[in-house]
Amino acid sequence: QKLCERPSGTWSGVCGNNNACKNQCIN
């Protein structure tokens, strides 16, 4: 699964099917 990263550089969680953080997904 892909992790999501906030603009601040801190981990915010994982990208779910709802693509809540799709713009911040990184491998």
Swiss-Prot record:
Question: Keywords assigned by UniProt?
Answer: Antimicrobial, Fungicide, Plant defense, Pyrrolidone carboxylic acid
Gene3D superfamilies referenced in this protein's UniProt entry, alphabetically: Knottin, scorpion toxin-like
GO terms for biological process, alphabetical: defense response to fungus; killing of cells of another organism
One Pfam family, short name:
Gamma-thionin
SUPFAM superfamilies linked to this entry: Scorpion toxin-like
Q: Which domain of life is it from?
A: Eukaryota
Coiled coil (UniProt feature): none
Q: Which residue positions does Pyrrolidone carboxylic acid occur at? A: 1
| UniProt cross-references to InterPro entries, sorted A to Z | Defensin_plant, Scorpion_toxin-like_sf
Q: Which family does it belong to?
A: Belongs to the DEFL family.
Functionally, this protein is described as follows: Possesses antifungal activity sensitive to inorganic cations.
Subunit organization? Forms oligomers in its native state.
> What's the protein called, per UniProt?
Defensin-like protein 1
Highest lineage ranks of the organism?
Eukaryota, Viridiplantae, Streptophyta, Embryophyta, Tracheophyta
